């Protein structure tokens, strides 16, 4: 992937028996289903909920952007801490942080809705509580991805990351679907439920997820030194960082305007928007789940090969969203978007994971995992700004971004050759 020669990393991650591996994988993926539920509940209701308290599209987007910036800054730190403290401990911290932060966020929204807080005070407190929430919640995914990297081999890493994505997406199906139903009670009910689910998941992880022994660094390297040296511009992972940052920026730009798009194009009320958009998000997540289970778990391709399949699908989806003017067409476009992202997300994470040593998995999970929040820092602000100019501009802009990104991915060949060398080296050591 880089033009500089590098040593081929070895695969000295902890070995588990087949039974232990299946059990650890099952518990991790079950926990991630709950995490996916909690993460996606907010997207279905934030747009209409924000409008109910008098916030503009740009104010709503700025809350997501600020929290995403914090996740971007905190994720690498949590990833490195998972190398030192262990994956399970960091996951539990993140889950409890999510529950508490989400509860505070929902409480401020409640006070603003009933008039106990002025709109400006409510907006500032929502920003503060969401930033606090993000600073601790950002521990979950780096630790989870690193845990999966710990229990998979070089040859099965892409499938393992695909399974992580599939679990999240299954939760993402439940989140908007149940969130839309719960929003029929009150718009805040989904957030209260998400906090309770996070606490239950934390207890589930504490008592059932096996601890994985820490991976020793290669001879001559200390764990702390090796992990701290890994950065965004490391030539082994830099191409993946470019892909991830631009890919997620485009996704965020679209994601944060879709609820407004549904409400304005279809002429829906706030509750109807939450319910209809929740169904659309559920369909999108289902398509993502199908692409990960039906394709990634059955076909062996390199990460960049999967990206070459996924990016054109996403570009087509964004063009369709710009042109769609009916409910069915908008949902169809979101299904395409889900299918494409279901392939692109795990491929990006797996590629970055495979590029580094086993003892660097926590660090790389934090760095790669922060590309999404980086995209969601810039994307929502651009999306809100473009949407105020023209409702279809965010989708055409994202379409334009993905074309040069696809060209960049098509030109990446060295990383695939290096991955083939790693798999061959592992096969030789096994025999």
Positions of PLM-derived features:
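Hydrophobic core of transmembrane alpha-helices in multi-pass small-molecule transporters
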Residues: 33, 114-139, 245, 329-343
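Juxtamembrane intracellular "pre-TM" segments in multi-pass secondary transporters
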Residues: 2-22, 210-241, 426-431
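Transmembrane alpha-helices of Major Facilitator/SLC transporters
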Residues: 69-73, 276-299
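Cytoplasmic helix-loop-helix junction between adjacent transmembrane helices
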Residues: 129-170
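Short amphipathic helix-loop junctions that connect adjacent transmembrane helices
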Residues: 44-59, 256-275
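C-terminal ends and interior cores of transmembrane alpha-helices
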Residues: 96-119, 313-325
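Helix-to-loop junctions at the C-terminal end of transmembrane segments
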Residues: 74-87, 290-303, 387
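Intracellular juxtamembrane helix-capping segments at the cytosolic ends
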Residues: 139-152, 343-357
């Amino acid at each position: 992937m880089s033009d500089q020669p590098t040593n081929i990393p070895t695969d000295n991650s902890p070995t588990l028996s087949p039974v232990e591996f299946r059990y650890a994988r099952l518990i991790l993926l079950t926990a991630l289903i709950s995490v996916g539920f909690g993460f996606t509940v907010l997207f279905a209701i934030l747009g209409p909920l924000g409008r109910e308290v008098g916030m503009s599209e740009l104010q709503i987007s700025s809350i997501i952007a600020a929290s995403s910036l914090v996740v971007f800054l905190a994720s690498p730190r949590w990833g490195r801490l998972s190398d030192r403290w262990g994956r399970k401990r960091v996951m539990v911290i993140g889950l409890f942080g999510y529950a508490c932060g989400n509860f505070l966020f929902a409480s401020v929204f409640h006070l603003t809705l009933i008039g106990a807080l002025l709109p400006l005070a409510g907006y500032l407190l929502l920003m503060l509580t969401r930033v606090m929430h993000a600073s601790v919640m950002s521990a979950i995914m780096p630790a989870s991805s690193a845990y999966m990297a710990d229990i998979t081999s070089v040859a099965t890493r892409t499938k393992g990351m695909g399974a992580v994505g599939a679990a999240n997406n299954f939760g993402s199906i439940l989140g908007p679907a149940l969130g839309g139903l719960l929003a029929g009670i009150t718009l805040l009910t989904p957030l209260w439920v998400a906090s309770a689910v996070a606490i239950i998941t934390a207890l589930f992880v504490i008592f059932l997820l096996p601890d994985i022994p820490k991976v020793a660094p290669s001879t001559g390297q200390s764990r702390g030194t090796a992990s701290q040296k890994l950065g965004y511009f490391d030539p082994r992972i830099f191409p993946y960082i470019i892909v991830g940052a631009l890919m997620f920026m485009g996704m965020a730009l679209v994601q944060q305007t879709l609820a407004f798009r549904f409400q304005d194009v279809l002429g829906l009320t706030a509750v109807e928007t939450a319910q209809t958009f929740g169904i659309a998000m559920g369909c999108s997540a289902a398509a993502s789940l199908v692409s990960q289970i039906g394709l990634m778990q059955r076909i062996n391709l390199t990460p960049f090969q999967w990206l070459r399949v996924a990016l054109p699908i996403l570009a087509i989806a964004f063009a369709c969203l710009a042109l769609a003017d009916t409910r069915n067409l908008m949902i169809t476009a979101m299904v395409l978007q889900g299918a494409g992202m279901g392939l692109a997300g795990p491929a990006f994470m797996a590629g970055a994971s495979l590029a580094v040593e086993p003892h660097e998995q926590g660090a790389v999970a934090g760095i790669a995992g922060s590309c999404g929040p980086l995209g969601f820092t810039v994307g929502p602000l651009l999306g809100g700004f473009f949407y105020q100019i023209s409702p279809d501009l965010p989708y055409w802009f994202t379409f334009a971004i993905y074309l040069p990104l696809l060209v960049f991915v098509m030109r990446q060949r060295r990383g695939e050759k290096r991955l083939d060398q790693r798999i061959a080296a592992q096969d030789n050591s096994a025999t």
